């Protein structure tokens, strides 16, 4: 069998191994529980704008949460 055929066969075997069983069985649940939510209320407004944050931090919005965070810089 050529190397291309072997790679194709290996690809199909990999896909087959990753498929969910068609018998309708779900994968077993992972052990443990989710930790409690952080103690912040669901909607917190720590800041109103960048200038209400200390130093170089920015006022970042995440849904209804406004909090001061260190900025990231993308090249």
Swiss-Prot record:
Tissues where the protein occurs: Expressed by the venom gland.
Listed GO MF terms: serine-type endopeptidase inhibitor activity
Keywords associated with the record: Antibiotic, Antimicrobial, Disulfide bond, Secreted, Signal
Gene Ontology cellular component terms for the protein in this record: extracellular region; extracellular space
Domain WAP: 27-72
Matches recorded under Pfam families: WAP
Locations listed in the record: Secreted
Signal peptide (UniProt feature, chain positions): 1-24
Family named by the database record: Belongs to the venom waprin family.
Record protein name field: Supwaprin-a
Species whose genome carries this gene: Austrelaps superbus
């Amino acid at each position: 069998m050529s190397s291309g055929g072997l790679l194709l066969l290996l690809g199909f075997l990999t896909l087959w191994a990753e498929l969910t069983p068609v018998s309708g069985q779900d994968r077993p649940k992972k052990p443990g529980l989710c930790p409690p939510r952080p103690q912040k209320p669901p909607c917190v407004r720590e800041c109103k704008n960048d200038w209400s944050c200390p130093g170089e931090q920015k006022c970042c919005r995440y849904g209804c949460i406004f909090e001061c965070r260190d900025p990231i810089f993308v090249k």
